[in-house]
Amino acid sequence: MMADSKLVSLNNNLSGKIKDQGKVIKNYYGTMDIKKINDGLLDSKILGAFNTVIALLGSIIIIVMNIMIIQNYTRTTDNQALIKESLQSVQQQIKALTDKIGTEIGPKVSLIDTSSTITIPANIGLLGSKISQSTSSINENVNDKCKFTLPPLKIHECNISCPNPLPFREYRPISQGVSDLVGLPNQICLQKTTSTILKPRLISYTLPINTREGVCITDPLLAVDNGFFAYSHLEKIGSCTRGIAKQRIIGVGEVLDRGDKVPSMFMTNVWTPPNPSTIHHCSSTYHEDFYYTLCAVSHVGDPILNSTSWTESLSLIRLAVRPKSDSGDYNQKYIAITKVERGKYDKVMPYGPSGIKQGDTLYFPAVGFLPRTEFQYNDSNCPIIHCKYSKAENCRLSMGVNSKSHYILRSGLLKYNLSLGGDIILQFIEIADNRLTIGSPSKIYNSLGQPVFYQASYSWDTMIKLGDVDTVDPLRVQWRNNSVISRPGQSQCPRFNVCPEVCWEGTYNDAFLIDRLNWVSAGVYLNSNQTAENPVFAVFKDNEILYQVPLAEDDTNAQKTITDCFLLENVIWCISLVEIYDTGDSVIRPKLFAVKIPAQCSES
């Protein structure tokens, strides 16, 4: 009870004190004024309200800013879409312009370039030929009728009462005065002689050979048949191996007599592909006023060196040797090949300058790509009996560009039957196993009534591979055993090597059979042991060189050589194309030489 009384008393006393003091309150922390407390509470309410307003305004501002950001983002997205559409439109316009340049402007520029470098100079040369022929004919007739020789032509010194002269010799292309080598051979010198009876003549004024410094002209093609020819090359700016492809020319024309009874060449029709760097390894075959040129198309470089990544693509270009005006696709026709019968081979392509026709069927030299795992070869057939260090597997291992390559290469022919109509169908025919070496550039041509096959020596068999064709389909060749013509080489396959080794090197240097009874051939070989140099035109048998003449100074580098021979007024002539480095600017360019095969073994 005492405790409770005290507690009550204490409360009462406190109330009294508060009533007495009125405005003062005492707590643990000290004495405070109630008015001040109330004023503080009011200030706190105002501050809280102000903070609330500020917070609301801040939230509103943040919301507004977010809305603005979203709107700006939306506008940006819309702008990006508009920009994207604009860019797509610009890209489409650029593509359309590029296509127009490629399809319309490019060919016109090419036509102008062709006219300035080929047609106009050729026509000037042809006009000069006609004038030369006319003058020569007038001289002959005046000399004959007036019974004296005219140094310069002075008609007024001749008796005007002389009979009218005979009609002068008209210009005529060789296609009207030439024939292929058929039947019995014509008379030629068959004795070994050191006399300079061969006199090469340079052909340089009617083919589009660019002589500007720094321009490399490589990958040439030459085919001559029935007085007509096909020609091709690739122009590069800078290095021959790594230069930028500028232009590829594929042209056809006639072989001409300029009045001096020496064959010349006049180009009549030229085609330039819009993408020159994609055209590789072309081969041409003539048939009834047209040359058919078959090419490999590749966007990954040379199909031989990029065989695994190359997706087989072929094209055929048909060019009229006597083009007509306003004749649609008669003059020039480009055809993409869609059907190829390749048998066990994964891919095939043309590989060599020229082929032949038999009836309505064209045959192009070719090569097939066969997976190494599917290549069947009996090592016991490898000719190592006289080779001390060669291994039996070398023949099999050397069938690819290296011993571990995915594909082996095998030579053969691509067959195209013109009479079938409809879609073009090509069929690959592989070469028989006798004397089998890696597939390389080859050539099949008709001479003296029978096809002849040449295959470049790109492997251990370095002697020239040339022989009569027993059958075209299947392709069987009677190889000659030549012991005097071999290509230069290094490493394990040097010149005159006949022992199987694993190597891949060599040059294309074909030869043309001009006498089957004595098996005499003519062509350009490289007279060097290790380096591709010293081009020499030679007439040779299997076991001896009868006579020869150098086509350049000693140590002049050269590579590919192509030779075609024919009759001009019953005299055998050959035209040889030679890839040669003698221009002084370290780039290669082809030269063409006309060489008459002498009937007599003494100089005339």
From Swiss-Prot:
Gene3D superfamilies: 2.120.10.10. GO terms for molecular function: exo-alpha-sialidase activity; host cell surface receptor binding. Residues 71-604 are virion surface. It comes from the Viruses. This is Glycoprotein G. Residues 1-49 are intravirion. GO terms for biological process: symbiont entry into host cell; virion attachment to host cell. Its main location: virion. The gene is G. InterPro entries: Hemagglutn-neuramid, Hemagglutn/HN, Sialidase_sf. Attaches the virus to sialic acid-containing cell receptors and thereby initiating infection. Binding of glycoprotein G to the receptor induces a conformational change that allows the F protein to trigger virion/cell membranes fusion. It holds the Pfam family HN.
